[in-house]
Structures are given as C-alpha cells and as structure tokens.
Amino acid sequence: MAKIRIHEIAKELGYDSKEIIEKANELGLGIKTASNAVEPEIAAAIYEYIQTREIPEAFKKNIKTPTAKKPKKENIKEQEKLNESEKKEPKKEEKLKQEVKKEELKIEKENAKEEEKQEIIDAHKPQSLASATLAKRRGLVIVKKKKDEEEIQVKKEEVKNSNDISINNEERLSLKTMFSNADESLKKKKKEKKSFVASKKESTEKMNFLDEHDFGDISLDDEDEVVLPDFSVKEQEKPQNINKKQPNFIRQAVGNSAGFGLEGGIQRRSRKKPSKKIEKKEVEEVGSVAISKEIRVYEFADKIGKSTSEVISKLFMLGMMTTKNDFLDEDAIEILAAEFGIEINIINEADEFDYVKDYEEETDEKDLVTRAPVITIMGHVDHGKTSLLDYIRKSRVASGEAGGITQHVGAYMVEKNGRKITFIDTPGHEAFTAMRARGASITDIVIIVVAADDGVKPQTKEAINHAKAAGVPIIIAINKMDKEAANPDMVKTQLAEMEIMPVEWGGSYEFVGVSAKTGMGIEDLLEIVLLQADILELKANPKSFAKASIIESSVQKGRGAAATIIVQNGTLTVGSTVVAGEAYGKVRAMSDDQGKALKEIKPGECGVIVGLSEVADAGEILIAVKTDKEAREYANKRHEYNRQKELSKSTKVSIDELGAKIKEGNLKALPVILKADVQGSLEALKASLEKLRNDEIKVNIIHSGVGGITQSDIELASASENSIVLGFNIRPTGEVKERSKDKGVEIKTYNVIYNLLDDVKALLGGMMSPIISEEQLGQAEIRQVINVPKIGQIAGCMVTEGVINRGAKIRLIRDGVVVYEGNVSSLKRFKDDAKEVAKGYECGVGIEGCDDMRVGDYIESYKEVEEQASL
C-alpha cells in the first residue's frame, strides 16, 4: 500500500505540518520534514494519538515513561495511613465538624445575602474529575488514571492549603464526604422535582462559558497531571438551592481552582438561562404586527424584529433592488411577511392627516336641506359642449376660447324655474383625460353631448366610461339637430352598441335632441336635469363646516393662488380657515363665475376663492377647519409625506427594470421648462409631453409650474444644455425677454394645445437620427468575366433595367442570393470611361475589392437616401 506523507496528514486534520511532526516525534518516529512518508499503519497511529491523546499500544515501548512509580508507592502508603487514621481517630473528625460549624456561623453573619443565593451542583464521582473532553478544550494535558490510588495522589497534589499532612488528609476526606452528600441530596430532589434539561450547546459556547470564570491557581506538577471537575450532571439538572451552609474551607475551594465547576460560575449561568427562555417566549408570543401601508425598509425591519440587511437580502432574492430608505408597497409587505412567517395587519398611515375622514366623522346629518345639482357636460372635441352651455347661460364663452376649443375646466351657475343649477364644462380634447375624470367624480349628473352629424367618437366613449365609473346618471344630448346631415338614429344605434339604450327603445337613458345654435330642445334638457335631480334627492347641511372640491387652480396677478371650487356640504364664508392637500390659508375673497364678489358659497354652488398658501392640486378636497394651527399641521404633514414618497420613487428599481434604466440612460432628451396658466392645463400638457417618446428620444420636463415665466425659469434653462421654455396661455414680460436673449434661451408660447404638441414633435424629430432608405437605380447581367493583370476582374455586362452609375453602391447577386456588396470602381463603354450606362447598352464594370464574379450573376445598383425622422 502507498505511503502517506506528513503534509497530507496535516492537511486532512487541519493542523500545521510542524505540529504533526512534533506529535510524530513524541511517538518516537524521528520525522524531520513534512515530505517524509510513513506507512498507513503508522499514519493511523498518528491520527489516533492526535485525536485521543492516548499513546497507541504499539508505540508505548518507544516512549520513555515518566518515573512516576515512586510517587505511586508513596501515594499508596499515604492512603494506607489515611485509612488507618480514619479508623483510629474518629474523634478528630468530630472536632473538625465542630470547627466547621463555627466557621459556618461566622461566615453566615458576614455574607448572609451571598449564602442565600449560593447553589451547589451535583459533582460526579472522583473518577470523572479527569474528564478528557473538557481537558482538551482547555488545552491541558491529562494523564488517564487507572487506579483509585492514583486519583487520591492527584487530589493530594492539587490542594495544598495546610502543612500538616494528617489534617490535610482529613480535610480532603471531609470534602469528598460533603460532595458525596450533596450528590445524594440532589438525587433525592431530582425525583421530587421535574428535571430541567438544558439545550445542547456547541463546543464553542462551552469554551466561552469556561472563559467567564476565574480558575485561580491551576498549576501543573512534574507529571503534568491536572484534574478538572465533570460538568455532565450540571448540563442535565437544574441547580437546586441548598439551605445547608458550607464550611469555610469549602467556600474557599469554590472560589479557587476547583470552584469554577461547582458554585460560582454555574450559579451565574443558571440566572442567565431563564432570561434567555423568557426572551424566546416573548418573540414567539408576538401576534399580528401593525405595518403602515407606506413603510420604509428599515422601519419594516424594526417592526418585525429583523435586521435591515436581512430584509434587503430577502427583497434582493425576490428580484427587488432597494435601499433602507425605500418604501414598500402592499404586495412587497405581504410577500415579506410570508417569507419571515409573520402575521401582519396593514394600516394606512395617511389616515393620521386625512382631514376629509375627520370631517366626515364629525359631520352632523341634522338640518339637511335640498342643494343645487352639479351637472358635468362631456363629449368629443368640437361637438358643441361649450356652445350649448353658452346658450343656456346667454353668454359667449365659446367665442373667447383659443382655437375654438375648451382647454380649461369651467364652473358656471344657471337659474331655472327659481332653482340653481351648477354646470361644469370639460375639454373634449384627448389630452384632458384627467380633467374629464375629475369632472365625472364630483358631479351628480353627466350630460354626454354627441354631434348628430358626426356620431360617437373616441372621447365620447371615454366620457361614457368615466361617467359609468363614477356611478352617476347619464343624459344624452344629441346636438346640431338643425343641420341637414343630422342623423339621430345613427347616434342612438352606436350608443346602443355600448349598452346606452334610449328610453323609447326600452332602455333607461334619456336622449334629448338639441341645437346650441337655435336653442331647440334646451328647455326640455333642463327639465329632465331637474327631474333627475329630484329623483336623486340631493341633500346637504348648510350649517356645518364647508367641504368643497377644487375644479381648477391658478395664480392671479396681484391676488396670488386662486381656486375654482364647488361646495358639496356646509357653507364657505369669507374669513374661513381652509386646507386643501398641501395648501392652506384663510379665504380673503370669493367671487362667482362672472367675477361678482360673494360673501358665502352654499352647497351645490360654485365660485373662485383667494387666500391659499400655494396653488392647490386640481381635484383636491377643500375642508374648512377651526384654527390656523390645525390647517397648518394637516398641510405640513401631507407635504412631508408626499416629499418622502417622491424621494423614494426616484431610487426604487427592480432587477427587471434595471436593464431598461440602463438603456434609458442612452436616450436623447429634450429638456423642457413648462409653465401654464392653470393647474389642470399643466397636468394635461405634462401627460401629453411625457407620451412623446420612443426608443431614441424623449421629453425631459426639468421644471413645471402654474403662473408666468420668471427670471428664475430662464436661469434654470440656461444651466441646462439645449433646453427650451414652453408657455401655455401666458406671455413673458419685457425683463424676462431681455434676460432670455442674454442667456440664449428660447421661449415659445402657445394658446392652443395642438400647436404646442406639433412643435415639440418637430423638435424631437430633428434630434432623432435620420431615416435611411434605398433608391433602386438599375440592374445589369454579367455575360463575360475578363481577368486584367494588376487590376483584377472586369465584368462585361448588359444593362437590363434602369442605369448603372460610376461610384454607386452595388450588390452582386448569384442565384437570388447577395454574395457581395460594394461600390463601382470603374465603368467603361468600350474603351471610354462612362459616368452612367442606360438600359439596353453593354458596359464593363469593375467592382471594388471583388474577385469572384461569374457569368450569369446580376449587378444591382442603388443609392441611400436620408429622410428626416418624425415622432
């Protein structure tokens, strides 16, 4: 069998080669280097010696045994003397016991508290004191004892507290007796009480436990014999309190070399064990954990008692790259809870500053009165919505609209038969989807206007879907009935396909034919509106705090932030303290849709208020509160909450999105600063501009706001390369124009949304790479191939289609497959150079870099044409 090298043994055991050499030499093998090889039997002996520290039988002859025979004889003699002294001198033991009792009383007075807490643990028989396992962990050398006489000798060498041998022997005997008594008492108690089985600890934990205690004066004698106490009983039994007081010399031993295994250390450990158990129970008994609907990663980790790194690692394993400050959505929270095995209860933290919820809880339903209905007019662009409202109001709003289309949400009051009706006019252009959705959500009745000569269009369908989603009644107004091309039956048929069935066809929807130009059917329409309002039984309490919806908001010169509102409940008065999202303040002034000053706005009525701290978001709920402090707290909490959410969104990205983010970094971007007159138009423009993108180009809105173009906007644009300033329904002042010229910033203003979007599309198209297309020039058939020295192949061709130009790009086609692409290097007609050869003529063609032309191949000539890309 092959020999085994020393370094192989060291590698397998995890030791250094030098250590293995030392151990081998202890066995008398005479190993010098790690490359020395030994027989497998010798290698097995080395394994056994290192692991058990016992010398194999085969090697005991090679090792010089320590001269321990003489001490053995002495030990035996001393043991015999000890036995004789035990028999002959029982009186000495009694005297010693009396002395022990005196020592007990003395120490009881001095250390009463300590004696109450002290415990004694069952010590094993003397044979177990030489535990090889514990000795190895302490790094001490143990010589295994085989006879009782050797054990007695070891004890005598360990304890040296007295010069008198006989007294010393008696004390050691008494100590042995005490431990044996303790062993018996513990066994009795073990039967009475349920044993406590401690959990098994790793070897490293046991070493740490031993390190916590003072070993006192542990010394090695000439024979390197060390005796350690046995812990096996302590790990299985719960320490019991011993009321019996111990003699002084035993307590000294407890604090000294033998004591670490008896009372002191074990007592401290026994106090720690119950605390750990309690902690575990507390963790297990934790029930449902309340988790906020919007919670950060580190907050979630704190809630469930895990480290942030654990949660982030788990999210990474689930395919989400997050930081500790990122917010978790509900799905992520539920998945994490399942992964960690925790029951959770998701709560909405936004309820803390939900002033609308607080308002609804406090609203008193007494004193309810009928309020004015709120009607929203919706439909496709240019179907006559504003014209219809103009006829009802006897106004000319439509004529003042830029481009003849509505681009704002307007709220108007109309009185019919002594009853007020509030109308909301919404834009029909596709860009104003958000405005139409808001109009449908705050209304009582929706009027869908459809042109009789045009039928149902995309925005008509969208408006119907918004109304259905809001769950409000729908009335269909078929407009332009005065035209010769009017076809109301076509409109009814198209709407019937969308499950909007007219009453006359057995449906539940009212259809009214009207003409905004002649006024036909207007009265009937208003009658149906009031009838529908009566069916709905619209009620409100004018005595409660006001609750209103913000239809539109803007910045008015000299007045500040203004908001168009419709009051839904309560009465809003001048001087009321209000809060709307992040905006708050006192109502300084209010006016109706025609600009007349008002002192109050009742339920169902509309108006414009001034006095908010900033421009409120369109669609926000406005609530009147008691104090300025309350309003400020609501607004500040909402502001901080929204800010933190926005910051988190900017950093959150999943693994699936990471590639898209990297790809997006290569996109060309058009930096834009966008300003508009009202919040609704700004939102519509932002949504439309963000849609103008493809794989190569996009619009980057670096700043947007409501109000005029300011010098700070120009400064921001100048700091951003190639940025432009876009204004909607606003004009720059003289100072701003001069500043823009100095900085080289281009300002473009518009009053029609179509024009703005078209110009931005053209700008984006100019930034895109041009589209390259091919234009076919001609084709020629190779009929002969001529090899010219130092030049290469020349193809004798017949032009079969179009023309072949010198310098043009060509393809060499063989059996319908392109085998080469290149340029025409030379073109000749007989011996003369030619610029081009037309169809039906023969020519010689040289192709740059091609030497594989064959008879029957075709040469196709073409040129590349660049076209401007468009979005």
Swiss-Prot record:
Belongs to the TRAFAC class translation factor GTPase superfamily. Classic translation factor GTPase family. IF-2 subfamily. Residues 60-101, 184-203 are annotated as: Disordered. SUPFAM superfamilies: Initiation factor IF2/eIF5b, domain 3, P-loop containing nucleoside triphosphate hydrolases, Translation proteins. GO terms for cellular component: cytosol. Residues 404-408 are annotated as: G2. GTP binds at residues 379-386, 425-429, 479-482. The keyword Membrane does not apply. It comes from the Bacteria. One of the essential components for the initiation of protein synthesis. Protects formylmethionyl-tRNA from spontaneous hydrolysis and promotes its binding to the 30S ribosomal subunits. Also involved in the hydrolysis of GTP during the formation of the 70S ribosomal complex. Residues 515-517 are annotated as: G5. Signal peptide: none annotated. It comes from Campylobacter jejuni subsp. jejuni serotype O:23/36 (strain 81-176). Residues 370-537 form the tr-type G domain. Its main location: cytoplasm. Residues 61-72 have a biased composition (Basic residues). This is Translation initiation factor IF-2. GO terms for molecular function: GTP binding; GTPase activity; translation initiation factor activity. Disulfide bonds: none annotated. The lineage of its organism: Bacteria, Pseudomonadati, Campylobacterota, Epsilonproteobacteria, Campylobacterales. Keywords: Cytoplasm, GTP-binding, Initiation factor, Nucleotide-binding, Protein biosynthesis. NCBIfam families: IF-2, small_GTP.
